[in-house]
A protein has these predicted regions:
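Acidic, surface-exposed loops and disordered segments
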Residues: 1-237
């Protein structure tokens, strides 16, 4: 197998994709044979799990780029006391041609804007949720019974088409995976010409969760609002 190295052209492709994430607290360090995603301590202290979830979006982007470059990504989540800032490391695995779906997801990286959203059908939400492939994560359609619990977390989903991203636990690794699942589902929506907007959820103590009439599944990490893009109304002069 021919070894993969991040040369000038592949770095340019990756750089263009990462720039499209917009403001991001995660730093991508591109080495010859790997990409190291780090969470700067100064930003981590201020942003809590938001920086890790944004590292997840960067992870999803690196994954997408490696696939169109014809490589299977290999992801590691090191627990290194000497480098506590490292969120994930991505290396290029064996060669495999990208599928048409993966090319579509790569193209969709350019279409992740956040306009006003008009609700979509449950069938659309179900199709998007089914495309999540990140381990130890789930993407579910928000049920009416979950609305009060989400409101306690400061999220208003009334009249919106929403998906809930959860993880099996609440470690640093799971925050990164949640961010990857959130970003990957946004790509799936963009491929279908739907717009989306991510909403990060604060951590909720177990005691508070136990008081809810219908407990949210897993560990809630983020919401994804999905819809048809509508133009923003201009304010009257």
């Amino acid at each position: 197998m021919t070894a993969f190295h991040w040369d000038t052209s592949s770095r340019a492709v990756l750089g263009d994709a990462l720039v499209r994430l917009g403001p991001n607290r995660c730093v991508a360090e591109v080495r010859p044979d790997e990409v190291v995603l780090t969470e700067p301590p100064s930003r981590r202290d201020r942003a809590r799990n938001a920086a890790l979830i944004e590292c997840g979006a960067a992870l999803s982007t690196v994954w997408t780029v490696l696939r169109i470059l014809g490589r299977d990504p290999v992801v590691a989540f090191p627990d290194d006391t000497d480098r506590p800032d490292v969120a994930a490391v991505v290396r290029a695995g064996p060669p495999r041609p990208p599928s048409s779906v993966e090319w579509a997801r790569y193209t969709a990286l350019r279409r992740l804007d956040e306009p006003e959203l008009r609700p979509v059908s449950l069938a659309v939400l179900g199709a998007l949720a089914s495309e999540n492939f990140w381990p130890e994560t789930d993407v579910r359609i928000v049920r009416p019974g979950w609305v009060p619990a989400l409101e306690q977390l400061g999220a208003d989903v009334t009249g919106r088409s929403a998906l809930l991203v959860t993880t099996q636990a609440d470690s640093r690794r799971h925050h990164v995976l949640a961010g990857a699942a959130l970003h990957g589902t946004r790509l799936a929506a963009a491929v279908r010409s739907f717009a989306s907007r991510g909403v990060l959820l604060p951590r909720q103590p177990f005691v508070e969760r136990a008081r809810q009439p219908e407990i949210l599944p897993g560990t809630p990490q983020a919401l994804l609002l999905v819809g048809l893009a509508t133009s923003k109304r201009r304010k009257p002069r």
